[in-house]
């Protein structure tokens, strides 16, 4: 790896130059970076050095890699206020983004041990387990596992679940999300979420766990969400 006077590694200098272009607006949200080969020529360096620079920028949340397409400037993060009653599709549209949800699988299965207590179930009770992928402006940002109660939403799997679950609940069951218990913390991206999101297993992620209640104050479902580390910020105004 090359260094220059001052003993600053070249990959950090290249990172600083690319970062300055992004933060100044010369490179805008969604812009594609030159290819690794082109960057090697621009900065007169090796591909190994360029990849170190790009990895640093990715860790900072400034760029992201689309498989077989290259590197792009990361879009603005979606922001979530936990005190507001909203859903993913509404959240995106309110912030000028285009949402999409894709159902990866939907099964009736025995309740996983880790969600048995919050859902107030017994060891061999059944739940509907939905795994879904959420997109903002065509970019996969969140892998979600929805744990739904058959007693509250019978025959749920017969409906189109490639969209807002909130709207399905309201339209077919007259059930409305009104409150939730939310916990969130950084974690490592698990294998199943990493594969769906197109990132490496073990990369940083933000985990959100929501226990949702309906208008009657009863538990409705539990969501476990893995967000790309560069795609969401959480803000709460206590004024």
Swiss-Prot record:
Domain of life according to the entry: Bacteria
Positions of the HTH gntR-type domain: 8-76
GO molecular-function terms, A-Z: DNA binding; DNA-binding transcription factor activity
Biological processes, Gene Ontology terms: negative regulation of DNA-templated transcription
UniProt KW Transcription keyword: yes
UniProt keyword annotations, A-Z: DNA-binding, Transcription, Transcription regulation
Keyword ATP-binding (UniProt): no
InterPro entries (alphabetical): Bact_HTH_transcr_reg, Chorismate_lyase_/UTRA_dom_sf, Tscrpt_reg_HTH_GntR, Tscrpt_reg_PhnR, UTRA, WH-like_DNA-bd_sf, WH_DNA-bd_sf
DNA-binding segment(s): 36-55
Protein name as catalogued: Putative transcriptional regulator of 2-aminoethylphosphonate degradation operons
Taxonomic source organism: Salmonella paratyphi A (strain ATCC 9150 / SARB42)
């Amino acid at each position: 790896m090359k260094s220059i006077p001052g003993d600053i590694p070249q990959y950090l200098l290249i990172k600083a130059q690319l970062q300055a272009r992004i933060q100044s607006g010369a490179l805008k949200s969604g812009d594609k970076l030159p290819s690794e080969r082109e960057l090697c020529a621009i900065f007169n360096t090796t591909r190994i050095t360029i990849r170190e620079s790009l990895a640093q920028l990715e860790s900072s949340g400034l760029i992201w890699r689309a498989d077989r397409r290259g590197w792009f400037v990361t879009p603005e993060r979606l922001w979530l206020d936990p005190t507001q009653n909203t859903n993913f599709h509404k959240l995106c549209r309110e912030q000028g983004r285009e949402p999409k949800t894709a159902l990866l699988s939907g099964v009736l299965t025995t309740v996983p041990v880790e969600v048995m207590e919050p859902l107030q179930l017994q060891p061999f009770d059944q739940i509907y387990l939905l795994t879904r992928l959420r997109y903002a402006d065509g970019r996969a940002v969140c892998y979600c596992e929805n744990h739904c109660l058959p007693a509250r939403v019978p025959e749920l799997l017969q409906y189109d679940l490639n969209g807002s679950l909130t709207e399905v609940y309201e339209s077919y069951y007259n059930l409305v999300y009104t409150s939730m218990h939310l916990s969130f913390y950084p974690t490592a991206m698990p294998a199943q979420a990493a594969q769906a999101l197109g990132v490496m297993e073990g990369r940083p992620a933000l985990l959100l766990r929501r226990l949702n209640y309906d208008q009657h104050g009863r538990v409705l479902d539990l969501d476990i969400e893995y967000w790309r580390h560069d795609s969401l910020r959480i803000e709460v105004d206590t004024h």
